[in-house]
Amino acid sequence: MSPKLAVVTVTYSPGEHLENFLSTLAVATTEKPQVIMADNGSTDGAPEAADAKYEHVRLLRTGGNIGYGGAINRAAAEIDSSIEFVVISNPDVQWAPGSLDELVAAANRWPRAGALGPKVLEPDGSVYPSARTVPDITSGVGHALLGTVWPKNPWTARYRQENEAVTERAVGWLSGSCLLVRRDAFDTISGFDSRYFMYMEDVDFGDRLGKAGWLNVFVPSAVVTHAKGHAAGRHPELMLPAHHRSAYQFQADRHPHWWQAPLRLALRGGLAVRSKIAVASAVRERARTDNSTDNPSVSNHGGK
């Protein structure tokens, strides 16, 4: 029987995460799918080592850091047209046994599912809210402004859907850290929008799938653990502005009319200010953490 699955992951100096990803993938499905690593300029040798070690793993160099969505699109274009499902996953994901087979089984239960996502666990075992509503202007702004200072605010709660029952259901969008995507659905919307260098590309992807008549389905019986931000967390001064630019792009795309120009202007200005505040806070926190690491006598307790 010809394989149903192919796997795409984007690498950027993934370190030991990549080996964990590949070794746990082996017990996540009874198939042995081809894995394409779209490499955006790794310098740690991890993708090359995996390419040499595993016969079913292929290294595809993108020629530079072209962003997450752009790299996914490049790799997807290399997949044989007979493949029914494409797994799109970060390389810092670890699969629970049988989890990918669970996603495929759910896809068979939901023939209009364009994308299906597992329950995503944090490294400490807590559940990450990976199945959410598409943010409108109200919930998006409310979450952006209040999410960190008032986590239980109604806009964040509505957006993150943390109070929803953990059941298999259709949702607005799914975390791009791990997705099973029906190839027909991917092709229908021409994959990811490469204008999103990083962040919000999964929100945009899920929203466009929904508008094209497909469903985004959350499948909590499938479980993965996500290390989260092995590359992004090291450089908040680069990544946080990228996140805010993508948030603006998402809302600007959905409010394109001339009479909405004041709204776009306000969004751009507000997000730019928030980005600067977030970067300053992250840099201070990084310096504090580094100082605590260098000086063990410094207490990590504080009045936050």
Where are the regions that the model predicts?
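Short, acidic, metal-binding catalytic loop of nucleotide-sugar glycosyltransferases
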Residues: 23-32
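A short, conserved alpha-helix in the catalytic core of glycosyltransferases
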Residues: 163-223
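Active-site-adjacent helix/loop segment of glycosyltransferases
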Residues: 204-285
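Short beta-strand-to-loop acidic/aromatic patch adjacent to the donor-nucleotide binding site
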Residues: 82-94
